[in-house]
């Protein structure tokens, strides 16, 4: 049964996807479903990114040399997860795998960035359901106008399963963790020093200044801390709920960036995430929760570095782990 229903407000203010209705607060990154085929287990959805509506975008300008703020990798993953969840509302999102981030999505003021999201099931017979998701964005001409061309920006797979309430499954965990304090060689960076780095070396503001302090770094290791915060991220939604904790993933991304800051302060280049082998999470973070961040480098070449990283709660439990996070120099 092909549901060619756009998501539209029903009298109760919910979104209508044909036979299932969704609350916009539960899917803040999906604006409309252009087409959904339950039998083939696939859907096409639409999302326009804009500074006016997406309050979080203005805070995300990781590089001073890029003119406009960017759609963050953390929110791209959230978009992927929401698309998969609409296809399988009875399942829980557990993570993503084989993610490739091919290009940045810049958001100039007054220019919305319309994007197409495609999601389909891949592989069957697993304990988990895997959905392949891709996001393509309408190109902007050199004059700053939208063209007819859509360019693929990122793709990956979302991991879901049906063990409701049981929490996520992290597998056998990451080898050689935890990162021990005696492995660290650099001095700690307190909150004041971290804020100074944000101000001097990046265009990150507010929500995206997620690092609280850095315990330090050593050969191939780094450790720090974040306090989890979520504020009102959307102009049109009061109580948006996410599928995972985007600002914890953001903190793990920034942690490996701070490795370079600590180990080689004279390095002027920046790093950008290109690939994520696999990300899994046990649960979502609570606002105000303090989380220890740690990462180990697994590979290094001329193009960049590959890492495994995790976030740990105050009980010592891993709540998010990332395997094969590949960062490239820019």
What positions do the PLM features span?
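Acyl-thioester-processing domains in fatty-acid/polyketide/NRPS systems
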Residues: 3-330
